[in-house]
Amino acid sequence: MKTIHQTNVGGAGGFYTGMEYARLADADWIWCMDDDVFPRLDCLEQLLAYAGYEGVGILAPRRLLEGRIYTNDFLSFNLTRPFSSMYSGRLSKMEVNSPVEISGTAFEGLFVRGEVVRLVGLPNKDLFIFCDDTDYCLRTVAAGYKILYVPTALMDKEKFFSDDSWGERNKKKKWKRFYQIRNSSYLNHHYGKNWAVKYLRGFNGVIGYILIAFFSAPFSGAYRWTDIPMFWKAYTDGIRERLGRL
């Protein structure tokens, strides 16, 4: 086992460093996961059963939260319709009992072929946190590889902030919201196929957070009115593709 110590470079920077080390070690496959997921004993075995499928570059396990299926995996990217989500065909709305080809998954058990990393490159470390996995899946699919969701490969996901109130939970997560807004705006601007997706989808998203902050600030400790210009800056940084640690 190799432990790498570095400064706080966010989740994206952590995956960048880990995957770079594995690539230099000429790894055939690289298993990426956050610290809040725990693979079942046969999870890797179940993933490897599909490693030989033609064109597969990434294998994605099924995650369970408190014993129930937890997934934000999806079938395809929507890069043309600005008033619909970027993520089309969410598996959370389907019953999936056999492997299915998808377009996006999370860095929570993502099992990527070393060949993909050598061709597509490393995660975008300048995203810091949020959307680095979506960006990587976009690049992988664009390079012609398939992503396969394997429902028999199971991982358990830990639940954080389970006993917190709405205000407490959002106060703890607020710093992440700025990255979420900026990076999702960046993705839409960078990969969107038309002006509306590039600018309006991110705008719609940030307006929602601005309204929540405006109306909840007097009544909860989650947001303050001073957060509003910061939310707007996160959006403008995204569409100008200014990344890095905030």
Where are these predicted regions, by residue range?
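Short beta-strand-to-loop acidic/aromatic patch adjacent to the donor-nucleotide binding site
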Residues: 27-36
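Acidic donor-diphosphate engagement hotspot in glycosyltransferases and nucleotidyltransferases
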Residues: 15, 42-44, 132
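A recurrent flexible, glycine/aromatic-enriched loop bordering the glycosyltransferase active site
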Residues: 92-112
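Conserved donor nucleotide-binding strand/loop of the catalytic core
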Residues: 1-13, 21-24
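A short, conserved alpha-helix in the catalytic core of glycosyltransferases
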Residues: 110, 116-121, 126-153
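Active-site donor/metal-binding and catalytic loop motifs
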Residues: 150-169
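Conserved donor NDP-sugar-binding/catalytic core segment of glycosyltransferases
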Residues: 42-74
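Non-catalytic, C-terminal membrane-associated alpha-helical segments of glycosyltransferases
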Residues: 193-246
